[in-house]
């Protein structure tokens, strides 16, 4: 059973400092593997009162998107306020072997900037026990000393703090339906979500395994909501809440066949809520923002100058210029090589598949260990999937370009790239994406050196007690495809 020991510690820690600092405390609540399935975002099947309250007492952003739909590139981008493709941190879990990645130029992680300004920096929650920090998952070399600890209780009297609370989120359900999680939900939340009541996207079959997994995922959202309430309750108990800006967001969407790792809204659209002094109450912002904007916004709220190299923007600034588009990138995930880019406006999404000769569901041990993916592959082999699911998930190749009218097609199932009526939109977004790749110095335009790939794969092959037969097969397949230009 998963434990969030550090979060419990957050609740039990004594109120160390009665006097509040003049500068606001900054708290990021960052959740793993979760889309915007909260009632304040329109989810009907479950109730999430604590996140809803946070939104009611603050500002909810309805169109927040991550620049990477998988943990480590997303978190590398977030902690620097830069696109992961600009800083060379775009491949998932890269730089973990003998070959390392260093940040370019003057770029430094945000905690360094907070420390220089006198803030106590800490990262707790999931993975934080004893002196161990909460989840970081950065794809570059960084200094442990940029964090003073894993809980704000260690700060000096009157010292403001920058705290990240990492929550397990969608990962609580594991790789598939399991009784341990379901029993824990029933014990702590009183009841489980009914799989029969689940509403799935149109491209997922209403199979019992897939329905149960989605119900378990919604219970992860409910449990996350409870944990958010626990964090806020401690701030209130210690009389810190009135001088603390609390941000709530997730690192990408639900882990599913078209969610995590992919650039559809299922993988990139995330909740983003902020509450605190000076923040508009009960407000909803419908303009497009990127998750790296959190970094610049937080620095500005703390009275810290936002560095010129930072690509995120202060979305609360009086002179803030709203984005007309947001961008995202998918590159290698674990052993699976990939290169996809996207640009999204209010109405349209353009996706460029640079490795379109490969299937959508490429072999990937992490993905293929999931019960839902195994079930989808079984149904595909038995020819029991409908035409839409077959086309979207199991076509042997993909279109080089995808274009979706999100107003008419929110699930992104009708590709308009070849439609003459949308030629002007296609060309405009194609150009916009190319300009972004050039202006931001997208490092994904150059293939990852095979030496770096091999260095990281040694880590994968050497870790844990898993049978690596499938992983070795996938690595060799990826190398073969790369040699063939596929």
Map each language-model feature to its residues:
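A short beta-strand-to-alpha-helix junction
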Residues: 22, 42-48, 65-70, 99-107, ...
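Polar, surface-exposed loop/tail segments
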Residues: 49, 78, 126, 131-141, ...
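A long, amphipathic alpha-helix that forms part
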Residues: 191-244, 301
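Active-site segment of extracytoplasmic enzymes that catalyze sulfate/phosphate-ester chemistry
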Residues: 28, 35-108, 113, 119
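Active-site regions of oxyanion-processing enzymes, predominantly non-cytosolic
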Residues: 19-25, 78, 139-201, 236-247, ...
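Long, internal low-complexity/basic segments
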Residues: 18-24, 31, 36, 60, ...
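Histidine-centered active-site microenvironments of extracellular/periplasmic hydrolases
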Residues: 46, 236-290, 307-311, 328-329, ...
């Amino acid at each position: 059973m998963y434990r969030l020991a550090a979060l419990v510690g957050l609740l039990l820690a004594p109120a160390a400092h009665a006097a509040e600092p003049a500068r606001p405390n900054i708290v990021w609540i960052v959740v793993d593997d979760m889309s915007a399935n909260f009632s304040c975002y329109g989810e009907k099947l479950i109730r999430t009162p604590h996140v809803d309250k946070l939104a009611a007492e603050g500002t909810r952003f309805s169109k927040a998107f991550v620049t990477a739909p998988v943990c480590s590139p997303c978190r590398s981008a977030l902690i620097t306020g830069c696109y992961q493709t600009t800083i060379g941190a775009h491949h998932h879990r890269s730089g973990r072997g003998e070959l390392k990645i260093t940040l370019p130029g003057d770029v430094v992680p945000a905690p360094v900037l907070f420390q220089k300004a006198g803030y106590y920096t800490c990262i707790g929650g999931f993975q934080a026990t004893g002196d161990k920090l909460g989840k970081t998952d950065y794809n570059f070399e960084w200094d442990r000393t940029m964090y003073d600890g894993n809980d704000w209780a260690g700060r000096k009297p009157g010292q403001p703090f920058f705290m990240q609370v990492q929550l397990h989120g969608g990962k609580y359900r594991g790789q598939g339906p399991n009784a341990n999680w379901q029993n824990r939900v029933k014990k702590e939340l009183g009841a489980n979500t009914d799989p029969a009541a689940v509403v799935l996207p149109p491209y997922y079959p209403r199979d019992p395994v897939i329905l149960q997994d989605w119900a378990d995922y919604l219970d992860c959202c409910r449990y996350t909501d409870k944990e958010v309430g626990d964090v806020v309750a401690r701030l209130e108990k210690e009389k810190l809440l009135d001088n603390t800006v609390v941000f709530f967001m997730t690192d990408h969407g639900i882990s599913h066949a078209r969610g995590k790792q992919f650039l559809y809204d299922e993988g990139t659209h995330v909740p983003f809520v902020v509450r605190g002094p000076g923040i508009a109450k009960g407000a909803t912002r419908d303009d497009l923002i990127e998750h790296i904007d959190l970094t610049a916004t937080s620095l500005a709220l703390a009275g810290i100058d936002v560095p010129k190299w930072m690509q995120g923007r202060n979305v609360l600034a009086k002179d803030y210029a709203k984005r007309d588009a947001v961008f995202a990138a998918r590159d290698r995930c674990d052993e699976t090589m990939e290169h996809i880019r996207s640009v999204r406006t209010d109405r349209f999404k353009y996706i460029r598949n640079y490795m379109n000769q490969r299937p959508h569901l490429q072999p990937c041990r992490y993905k293929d260990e999931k019960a839902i993916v195994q079930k989808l592959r079984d149904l595909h082999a038995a020819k029991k999937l409908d035409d839409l699911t077959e086309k979207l998930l199991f076509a042997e190749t993909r279109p080089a370009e995808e274009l979706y009218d999100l107003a008419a097609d929110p699930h992104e199932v009708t590709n308009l790239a070849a439609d003459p009526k949308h030629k002007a939109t296609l060309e405009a977004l194609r150009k916009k994406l190319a300009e972004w790749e050039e202006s931001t110095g997208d490092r994904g335009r150059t293939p990852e050196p095979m030496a770096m790939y091999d260095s990281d794969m040694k880590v994968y092959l050497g870790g844990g007690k898993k049978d690596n037969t499938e992983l070795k097969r996938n690595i060799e397949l990826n190398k073969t495809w790369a040699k063939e230009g596929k």
